[in-house]
């Protein structure tokens, strides 16, 4: 509404959806419309997973699933929308963009960026070559709600687990 020019952007979890769509070239009104259109698909609960959960609890007394939703709906939505803007890989995005996630096994922050990043002091891992759908799926993989996202040999979860607001990373773009 105020026509503020945005030079770079970052987002974690659902913020990664907004940041990615904006960086790919969608206007705020378009992003609002996309959320309204696809919200139910994103929130979809896989009833097979609920059955597995109940079956596992009854037979073993243990939780045998890693999420109520696989996260594939986010992956497909982001790929669909970004592919319409000729964005397939995070490196295809021209606007500086940072999307954090967390390695579930090591606890390391994995930051996906659209451009090379300057030196950084902590153990954050920077990746600027990844499928755009995987990037956002990983950042949105909130434990127990969404299954962890497989990326290379790692399992990634919601960036908010360690890096809720990626201001430091954006600062280094």
Where are these regions (language model features)?
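Patatin-like phospholipase
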Residues: 1-12, 20-173
